[in-house]
Structure formats: C-alpha cells, structure tokens
C-alpha cells in the first residue's frame, strides 16, 4: 500500500468518524432537549438579576484577555518589535475568531502566522513556535485531566459509569509528560527551552477561566454544586468537544455538560439556560468585541505598514496571489466587521421582540406595545437589508442604519429599557459615524433584480419573525390572556408601511440633496479638443445641447453622456487624445461609483472594446453601420442604372439640390421648420443619439436641400462632420410626405456625390438596428433572441428593410455595441437607453 493511498484512507476514516460522531451528538442532544419545558426556561431567565448578567458577560469578554499571554510569550521569544497594546488587540481578535471557527486551533494558528510574519524574517522559527502554541492548547487540558484522574476535580459519577470517559482521560493525561519532555529535550531555541512549559501553564489558566465562566453562569441560574466536581465535568465535556472537531465543540460539549449535571439531579431547564448564557458570554460577547477592535485595527494603518514593511514575505507557493490580495483584504476588514456587527445587532433585537410581546401581553395599553413592536421590527429589517451597503461603504446605507439604531433605541427605552442593550446601540452608533466619515460612495444603484431580492428577503424575515413570536407564545402558554387580536392582525401591515415611509423619505431626500451634478458643456474646449485630435461619427452631436460632457484632468479628452434613472448613458466612444482615454474612463467610473450610478455606453465601435473590457463590462451587438467608401462609389455602370434613373427623374422634374452653408437666415430656418413639421406629423422628436431641430444646432454644419421648379423646399438633410479621417455623416433627413417621390434616395445620392467631390473618403449612412446579430447558434441567448426579432418582427419595425435599403449602396458594415456593467440586466439597460432617446 502506497503512502498516498494510506493518507487518503486515513482522511476518509477521519471524515466517517467525525460525521458519525456529529450525527450521534445531534440525535442524542435532540432527544434530551425534547423533554425540556421551554416555558420554565423562559421563566428562569426572567428571574435572573440583570446586574449578575452584565457581570457574566463582562467576565466572558475579559476571560479571553488571558489568551493574550500566548502572544506575549511568542513576541518575547522571537524578540518582535511590536507594541504591547497592539499585541493584546491582535491577540484578542485572533482568539475570538479561533473560538468560533477554530477547527482544533488551526484557524488561530493560520491567522497568527499571517499577522506576525510581517514583523520577522525568520518565518521557520515563527511557524515552529506557533505549532507549540497550537499543541499546548491540548496540554492544558492534559494537566487538568491528570487532576481529574487523581480525583482532585471529582467527576467519579461519570468516570465510573462511562468506561470510554476513563480511557480518554488516561490517554490525554499521558500527553502532557511526553510534550514537556520533547519540548525541553529538543527545544526550537535553546535560549527558550521552557517555551512548552510556559504555554502549558497559559493553556491551563485558559481552560480554568472558561470553566469559571460556565460555573458563574450556573450559579446565576441557581445551580449549586461543588466547584471541584463542576470542573471535572467541564474537563470531560471539553475533551468531547475537541474530539468532535466541531468549531467551539458545539453540540458535543453541551451534551456532556447536560448529561453530567443531569446525573446529579439538576433540572434540564436550568442546565440549558446556563449553557446558553455561557455560550453568549464566552463566545458571542468576545466576537462582538473583536469585531469592534478589528474595525480599528485593520485598515489604512495595517495597509500602510505592509506597504513599507521590509519583512513582508508572502507564504510559500502562494507568493504572487497573496501579494495581490493581502493588503486589500486587510483594508476591507473594518467595513466587513461593521457589517457583521450590524447583522448581529438586527438579529439580537429581532429576538428581543419577544420581550416587547411578553411585556405587552401583561400591560393594559396593548396598542403602544404593538406600535413599538412594529417600529423595532421595521428598524431591524432595515438594518439587515443595508448590511451589504454598509460593507460597500455606502453613505445612504449608513444613514438608513443611523435611523434604524435610533428607532430601536426609542423602542427599547419605551419598553424593557435594558442598559446593556442601550450601551451596545451607542457603540454601534459611534462606529457608524466613523464609517460614514470614511465612506467611499454616496449610494449604491438600485436595480429591479436587487429590489425583487430585497422584497422576497423581507417577506421571509418577517415570516420567520412571526413564527418566532407565535411559537414562543405557544410555548409559554399565554394564549389564555385576553388581547386585542385585531392589532396583531395588522402588525405585519404596520411594519410594511413604516418601512416604506422610512425608505421612501430618506431615498427622496438623499437623491434631492445629491442629485447628479450637471457638468456644463464648455463648447470652446470641446471645439479645441476636436480640432486638435479629431472626432468620430457622433462627435458633432455635442452641439445638440441635450447632453453633458465629462472631461479628464488634462482637458484633452471627453465623453458625452446623459443622466437618466440612476444611469449615465454615454453616447459613442471617447473623443480626444487616445492616450488619455483610459484615465478618462477611470475618472468617469469613479465619479459614477461615488454617485451610485450605472454606466451604459451606446453605439460604441469595436476599436476600443479591450479598453471597455478592462472595466468589467459586458457587450451586446446593437447592429451595424453602413460606411460607404467614396473612393470607389460611382453612379456609372450597369448595376448603378437605378441611381442614374433616380437622378434623371429629378432633373426632368426640375428639382434641384444645393448645399447651404451657415450662417442661415430666419426665412431659411422657417422653410426647414415647415418641412420638418410636415414630416413629423405630430410625432415627438427623438433625442440624444440624433441631432436636435434647433436653430443653434443646425447652424453648426451645412445643410443639403432639394427645391422644386418653383423654388419651394421639399426636402433637406443636415450634415455631421466627423473632423477626422476625411469622413462625413448625415443626421436629420426630412421631406414633405405628401409628395410621391423617392426624396430620400435623391438626398442620399446627391450627398454622396457632393461628398466625393469635396474630397471625403467615407460616408456614414447610419445603423441598421439588430442587423447581423445572433446569427450563429454559438451566440449568446440574448443575441439569438435579438436576431429572431430582426427576422420575424419586420412588420412592427423595418429591421430588414433598413438593411436592404442600405445594401444597394454597397457599404462596408461596421458593428456597433451596447456596453453595460456586469451584474446589470441587458433589458434594463436597453430600456434606460430608449428612455433617453425618446424623452427630452
């Protein structure tokens, strides 16, 4: 049998053992808990002196400070230049984390290595010392096991009745002398020969502190037994928790304590309550304190230190990966810790709804308590819904949290007025103030998908809250109390109304105060950039007056955009110095992220797609633009006889074409308006992606007109210079609809011939929407659907007709794309673009 196979088999049997043990513990614990009278447990909890409860929680929080002795020994042994106060802070965070998700202490060992390797260049010795600390966590229990075997901590009622307990104690007791002998005989450093002994003493003190906290919890719930006997039961339970490899020994530890104390004639209700208080005091309270400490400890200070540390050596085999992520992870620890604290706060006060309900049942003024219940439930739900926003550093989410904390505090003061909980709310409020000051964005964009998820989550949470309250009332058997059930019936709707009012008012005020700032168009600067660096097929639309412009810091490039429905819709590619496009887009994305807006690019070319891709965008092909090569365009030849026939027809009718250069007279503009109004026939003008029929815009470029034999204007088209590559485009094309003449053909042909005569090389006839989109079965589903629309909905919109019409001019087809950010919906982005185009 190979070594690899042996290792796999060992891992497999370990997994089977751990799984079987876990299932056994769960079923046994369930069987024991099924006999417990939860009403009696709640009654016992109500009798507890609140001062003793505060002292228990304080003791649980302070007990973890003893574990800092491990880190002090480590720092002294390695002679690390690290402030003592920081050692205590870091150690507390590590040990609190290790107690919850320890997996035998390996999580704590990993975090220690991660933190302390930045203070030393001898990582080998660091790992060896951390290994001693990891193993010594068991040696403390080994020492206590020896005392249990010697009956100093008397647990004979368990040892004599359960044979496997005796054998576990003997095995663990033998581990201590072996460990001490090995670490003294073969020390990591001869100058620190007794490192294992020191760590064993700390481990023993640690376990005794934990036993003392549990014993104090037992005394509070009126359990009175010998301390020596209690410690004996605790040691056996701790060993069971370690063997189970379940983080914190959850389940296995509690089951052994429950069975051990039950065998002494103590009621199960008291034991359960003592265990819950112990878990809260020794695990939950330290974690909350650790989260608060981490919001200060890890952040800009740690990030700056890592940037400047000469001892920064990433872990072997993950060098490049860790170097790129370690600093970013540390920088996110404060916001992540605050988000966890907010989530836990909401859960705590959701559970505290039981207190409001219970007090309200025995109070004559039911209505006030139901209002307080609805307010607190609404505030807790609002906290949960904004946890992600707080993690992302959104000021609006933090403001929602501010309001929620104030509402929870008000409900708490009016009802049960717990000093401990009010103190906690004050701490959270202070942390939120600090988070607001360092927030990176004003708000995060809301999307239909996100709103739907939040709605479903709200319904689910409110349903769970209802189940919790109703289940507790049933367990306490309080339905015999006469209450106003109509108020309970409308409690759900009261909560919904309060949430809607809070969200609506704050969102409106926030949007009103931080409305998207208008970047005034400096046409002089735009002209200078276009004249120096050139434009594109859409750059002339900067003069339409319905868009804002965003310039880069050097003022040598800009983009045209318009704000609509929390989105910044950009028209075309950036304009200006191509070397500045990346910095321009980076600044624009930072601006949009701070404001909480989505970014959508409309009608971009494929030239800069790698640049858009770098910003995490997705692409959708809108269609293709028809670009005619004027160097090869001609009306001569057999295939072009249709063009000649059209031109000859206009000549026979004495219809003339001419180009009018600006400035234009008022009479000329009145003629244009007459034709335009007839062509529109009451329809609204389109915006954004086409020019505006205004005297200011039309005066920026020449206009081609067609007149009949009497000199009356019957058609016109406005030109769009591109200011680059000798290309030109056409914008507005309008004619008198009552005339049965191919006026659009006439305008295009005359414009093509005029452009060629003037030396232009290319002519843009515009886009054929959805043309050549999703034609392959390998294409994205959304593009294949768009392709089917192109093929089968020609009656609603002339998709195919537009392409066939432009095909007769033999153009080169260039693709145009819609660019939108990842995690955003294509259809929602398209809808916003259409709203920009259709509405002024």
Swiss-Prot record:
> Reaction catalysed?
L-lysyl-tRNA(Lys) + a 1,2-diacyl-sn-glycero-3-phospho-(1'-sn-glycerol) = a 1,2-diacyl-sn-glycero-3-phospho-1'-(3'-O-L-lysyl)-sn-glycerol + tRNA(Lys)
Q: Where in the cell is it found?
A: Cell membrane
What is the membrane topology listed in the Swiss-Prot or TrEMBL record?
Multi-pass membrane protein
EC number of this enzyme: 2.3.2.3
The residue ranges for the Cytoplasmic side of the membrane come to 1-8, 74-89, 151-161, 222-229, 292-337, 388-392, 437-450, 511-840
List, alphabetically, the SUPFAM superfamilies matched.
Acyl-CoA N-acyltransferases (Nat)
| Keywords carried by this UniProt record | Antibiotic resistance, Cell membrane, Lipid metabolism, Membrane, Transferase, Transmembrane, Transmembrane helix, Virulence
Extracellular compartment spans: 30-52, 111-129, 183-200, 251-270, 359-366, 414-415, 472-489
Question: GO cellular component terms?
Answer: plasma membrane
Q: Which residues cross the membrane?
A: 9-29, 53-73, 90-110, 130-150, 162-182, 201-221, 230-250, 271-291, 338-358, 367-387, 393-413, 416-436, 451-471, 490-510
Q: GO:BP terms for this protein? A: lipid metabolic process; phospholipid homeostasis; response to antibiotic
Single GO term (MF) = phosphatidylglycerol lysyltransferase activity
Report the protein's function.
Catalyzes the transfer of a lysyl group from L-lysyl-tRNA(Lys) to membrane-bound phosphatidylglycerol (PG), which produces lysylphosphatidylglycerol (LPG), a major component of the bacterial membrane with a positive net charge. LPG synthesis contributes to bacterial virulence as it is involved in the resistance mechanism against cationic antimicrobial peptides (CAMP) produces by the host's immune system (defensins, cathelicidins) and by the competing microorganisms (bacteriocins).
Q: Which family does it belong to?
A: Belongs to the LPG synthase family.
Name recorded for this polypeptide: Phosphatidylglycerol lysyltransferase
What organism is this sequence from? Staphylococcus epidermidis (strain ATCC 12228 / FDA PCI 1200)
Instruction: List the top taxonomic levels of the source.
Output: Bacteria, Bacillati, Bacillota, Bacilli, Bacillales
């Amino acid at each position: 049998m190979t070594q690899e196979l042996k290792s796999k088999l060992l891992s497999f049997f370990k997994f089977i053992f751990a799984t079987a043990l876990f299932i056994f513990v769960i079923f046994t614990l369930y069987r024991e808990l099924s006999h417990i009278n939860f009403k009696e447990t709640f009654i016992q909890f109500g009798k507890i002196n609140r001062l003793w409860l505060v002292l228990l929680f304080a003791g649980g929080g302070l007990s973890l400070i003893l574990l800092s002795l491990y880190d002090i020994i480590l720092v002294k042994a390695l002679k690390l230049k690290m402030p003592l106060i920081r050692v205590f802070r870091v150690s507390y965070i590590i040990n609190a984390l290790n107690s919850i998700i320890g997996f035998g202490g390996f999580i704590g060992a990993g975090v220690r290595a991660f933190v302390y390797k930045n203070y030393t260049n001898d990582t080998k010795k660091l790992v060896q010392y951390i290994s001693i600390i990891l193993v010594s966590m068991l040696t403390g229990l080994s020492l206590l096991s020896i005392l249990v075997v010697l009956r100093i901590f008397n647990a004979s009622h368990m040892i004599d009745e359960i044979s496997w307990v005796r054998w576990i104690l003997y095995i663990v007791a033998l581990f201590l002398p072996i460990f001490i002998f090995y670490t003294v005989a073969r020390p990591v450093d001869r100058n620190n020969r007794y490192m294992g002994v020191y760590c064993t003493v700390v481990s023993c003190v640690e376990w005794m502190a934990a036993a003392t906290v549990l014993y104090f919890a037992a005394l509070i719930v009126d359990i009175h037994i010998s301390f020596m006997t209690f410690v004996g039961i605790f040691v056996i339970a701790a060993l069971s928790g370690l063997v189970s490899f379940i983080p914190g020994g959850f389940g296995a530890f509690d089951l052994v304590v429950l069975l051990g104390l039950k065998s002494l004639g103590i009621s199960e209700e008291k034991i359960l309550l003592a265990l819950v208080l112990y878990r809260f005091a020794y695990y939950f309270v330290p974690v909350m304190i650790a989260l608060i400490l981490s919001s200060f400890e890890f952040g800009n200070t740690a990030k700056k230190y890592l940037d400047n540390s000469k001892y920064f050596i990433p872990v072997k085999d993950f060098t490049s990966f860790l170097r790129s992520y370690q600093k970013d992870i540390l920088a996110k620890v404060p916001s992540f810790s605050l988000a966890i604290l907010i989530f836990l706060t909401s859960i705590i006060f959701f559970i505290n709804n039981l207190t409001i309900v219970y007090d309200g049942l025995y109070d004559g003024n039911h209505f006030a308590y139901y209002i307080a219940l609805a307010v607190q439930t609404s505030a807790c739900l609002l906290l949960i819904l904004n946890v992600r926003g707080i993690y992302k550093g959104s000021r609006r989410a933090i403001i929602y949290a501010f309001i929620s904390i104030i509402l929870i505090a008000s409900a708490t003061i009016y009802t049960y007025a717990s000093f401990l909980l009010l103190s906690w709310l004050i701490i959270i409020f202070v942390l939120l103030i600090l988070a607001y000051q360092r927030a990176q964005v004003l708000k995060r964009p809301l999307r239909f998908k996100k709103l739907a998820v939040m709605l479903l989550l709200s319904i689910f949470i409110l349903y769970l809250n209802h189940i919790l309250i109703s289940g507790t009332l049933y367990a306490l058997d309080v339905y015999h109390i006469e209450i106003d059930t109509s108020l309970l019936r409308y409690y759900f709707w009261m909560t919904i109304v309060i949430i809607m009012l809070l969200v609506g008012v704050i969102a409106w005020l926030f949007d009103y105060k931080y409305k998207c700032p208008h970047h005034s168009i400096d046409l002089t600067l735009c002209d200078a950039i276009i004249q120096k660096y050139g434009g594109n097929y859409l750059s002339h639309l900067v003069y339409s007056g319905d868009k804002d412009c965003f310039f880069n810091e050097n003022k040598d490039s800009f983009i045209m955009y318009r704000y609509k429905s929390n989105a910044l819709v950009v028209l075309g590619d950036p304009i200006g110095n191509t070397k500045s496009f990346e910095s321009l887009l980076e600044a624009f994305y930072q601006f949009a992220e701070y404001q909480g807006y989505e970014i959508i690019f409309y009608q971009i070319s494929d030239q800069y797609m790698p640049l858009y891709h770098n910003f995490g965008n997705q692409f959708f092909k809108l269609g293709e633009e028809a670009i005619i090569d004027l160097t090869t365009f001609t009306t001569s030849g057999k295939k072009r006889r249709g063009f000649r026939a059209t031109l000859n027809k206009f000549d026979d009718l004495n219809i003339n074409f001419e180009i009018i250069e600006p400035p234009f007279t008022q009479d000329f503009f009145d003629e244009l308006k007459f034709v335009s109004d007839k062509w529109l026939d009451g329809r609204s003008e389109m915006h954004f992606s086409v020019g505006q029929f205004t005297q200011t815009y039309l005066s920026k470029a020449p206009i081609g007109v067609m007149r009949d034999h009497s000199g009356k204007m019957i058609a016109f088209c406005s030109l769009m210079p591109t200011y680059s590559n000798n290309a030109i485009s056409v914008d507005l094309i309008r004619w008198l609809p009552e005339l049965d003449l191919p006026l659009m053909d006439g305008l295009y042909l005359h414009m093509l011939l005029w452009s060629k005569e003037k030396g232009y090389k290319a002519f843009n006839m515009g886009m054929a929407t959805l043309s050549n989109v999703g034609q392959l079965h390998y294409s994205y589903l959304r593009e294949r659907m768009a392709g089917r629309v192109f093929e089968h909905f020609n009656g609603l919109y002339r998709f195919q007709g537009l392409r066939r019409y432009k095909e007769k001019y033999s153009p080169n087809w260039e693709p145009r794309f819609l660019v939108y950010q990842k995690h955003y919906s294509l259809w929602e982005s398209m809808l916003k673009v259409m709203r920009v185009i259709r509405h002024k």
